[in-house]
Amino acid sequence: MAALLAAAGIPVGARLTVLSALRTMPFEQAAPVDPVVMAKVLDQRVPGHTETTVLGGEARLVSLDSLSGKLQTGKGRILDLHLLPAAKDTLIALIETIDSPQPDSRLSVFDRNWKLKWNFAPTAPQSAPEGSVMFGAMVYTPASATLTVDWREAGNDSITAREEYLLTPKGVKRAKK
């Protein structure tokens, strides 16, 4: 088994799982969900399970599978975690989406110890109306390694533009059309 893990580039005895990544997520990323509440939510492993935070908000497990987990960590805030297998290790991709007034996301990629490797915050498309305020909501599709950004103008729920990127352990590049 050790040889198989080593051949796959996974350090022996240190296999990173979605649950272990969520359990070790620093408070800076998980706030306002403290470690005790996070443990209660994750121990259930049942999507929809909700716990009350120390500030009276709710922490809810939205989804969980072998490569990703999604948590609602407050009203209008979603953390979408994905594991990115890399040559020598597995990285953690964390999409934080705030829904106020429109969904707006940012992507941060960390090593297994939650040390920041790089960030990605796309700029509004050139097709955006001049002077408008644009919000980009990200969705990652692991099967195709595609990061989709849906752009909306402030005050308008309709998608104004859609951009697709390929997400790799080294960075993000625009997908070919």
Where does each model-flagged region fall?
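Short consensus segments that form the blades of beta-propeller domains
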Residues: L71, T97-Q102, A154-N156
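Short, hydrophobic/aromatic-rich segments at coil-to-beta transitions
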Residues: S66-S68, D89-A93, S144-T148
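Short aromatic loop motif centered on NTY/YTY
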Residues: K117-K177
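Mid-length scaffold segments of soluble, non-membrane domains
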Residues: A87-P122
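Terminal domain-start segments
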Residues: L4-L83
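Beta-propeller blade termini
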Residues: D80-P85, A137-V139
